[in-house]
Amino acid sequence: MKIIEEFRSIAGDIKIIDRPEEKEMYSHDIGDVPSFMTKMLFETQPSFVVQPKSVEEIKKVLAFANEKNIPVIPRGAASWGFGGVVPTKAGIVVDLSPFRKIIEIDPEQKTARVEAGARWSDIDIVAKKQGLSLMTYPSSKFSTVAGWIATGGYSINSFRYGHLSKQIQSMTVVTASGESKTLTPDDKEFTYYISTEGVFGIIVEATLMLRPTPEASFSHLLYFKNEHASFAFIDRFVNSKEIENISVNVIRFLDENHMGDTNEVMHAKVFKESPAV
């Protein structure tokens, strides 16, 4: 009996995707790597894809994969672009993008309890209705919560609030054997799921800390004659006493090519094209 048929016999209501043309969508991410390279070196098309609707369904998938020794690839919005969600030896892709409920916004505790596939943009919209905002979020605000926990942690507002792991109050995971656990930063296993790309299991839920929505926020563009001058300024700025009186959320470096591309996308010369911004 084929693996897909074995799984189908115990899957119950779990949605299964196994048509070749649909599976092909899961053989790449947002990154632009020529398919002839990946397909020559790896088996990038999954054996099949599942879209679980509950933690119990995820547990069933992982227990089956563990028993059959089949690779499992958790997948969110696939916006990272470095191949972390691309299969290399076929296996089962667990698509968590539909697993996206915002379970609760707690105004008193200033927290958001969300499912793994919740989009950062959706959380921010819902939280702002209660006067709260995300502390940090990735450059792709349409990526998923578990996706950023599993792959990164530094981005917008990190200069002020630090790594994403500092803003996770707790998270629920399902281990490779199919066991669910709720972990806090005090647990040793907590760090196993930060920036490890799903190697130790699947993040299914997280409780995130929020902040009061600021009254105002301003962006500033500073132009420099070259990158050395810009980096020297940043070094002086972050080490100066004045920074204690300024609420800086993020510092970004942009080069002339980036500004040129931005102007091209906007079909107008909106920004001055400087060697360093």
What are these regions (language model features)?
Residues M1-A63, S79-K110, L210, F253-A268:
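N-terminal flexible segment immediately upstream of the FAD-binding catalytic core
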Residues I14-E21, P71, M135-P138, F237-T262:
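Flexible, glycine/charged-enriched surface loops at secondary-structure junctions
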Residues P20, P74-A78, L96, A116, ...:
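Glycine-rich, histidine-containing beta strand-loop boundary motifs that form or position
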Residues F48-K53, F218-Y223, V277:
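Short, well-ordered beta-strand elements within core beta-sheets of diverse protein domains
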Residues K101-N239, I243-S247, I251:
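FAD-binding subdomain of flavoenzyme oxidoreductases
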Residues A268-V277:
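A conserved active-site cap/scaffold subdomain adjacent to cofactor or substrate pockets
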